[in-house]
Amino acid sequence: MNDKKIDINVYSENFPNSEKVYVEGSKPNIRVPSRMIKQTATKLNDTIQENEPIYVYDTTGPYTDPKYDIDVTLGLKKTREEWIKDRADTEESKRSYLDTLKPNFDNAQYGISSRSRKAKSNKNVTQMHYAKQGIITSEMEYAAIRENIFHNRADHDNKITPEFVRDEIASGRAIIPSNINHPEIEPMIIGKNFLTNRTPSTAIFLISSL
């Protein structure tokens, strides 16, 4: 591939009558995507009634954001990178995940790092550990905002709070798959009290990612 840039509009055309929008959290680097779907007006008894747009869970990633500048050499946007570093409980490993795949890979050529991260000595970096310590992480806040996407009207009392998410994780009733070496992940929560209550790969996440 000679051209490293991708025309974002090609992807956006797959979602007519809709727009990718964001809900900002308590910090500027917490921006949760959702898709606003426009509804046509309803004709009833010779009157036209406008219908409010519908907001749905959006998991399509940055490639459906018309404002996102895609460069395939840089990979996906690292949504969680700042959150992970701000917690100051991980460090860069000497091991690179590209050492065996591409021994001669030149990181500097692309301005990226292929070094893995690991927990610092005597540190636990799982979302369950944070939850049990009473810590509400950015991932938990992000997941809570996502859960309320369907209820974003001003007259609706949001029932899913970051604290509720934390408590569900601490109790073992829910998980947020969030490996520290996948900062590109847009956090979602899986549990019986949430929009996604089961997934075939949950067992794999529990074993290899948490």
Predicted regions and their residues:
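A cross-family glycoside hydrolase active-site/sugar-binding cleft signature
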Residues: 199-201
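Non-catalytic terminal accessory/regulatory regions of metabolic enzymes
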Residues: 1-196, 205-206
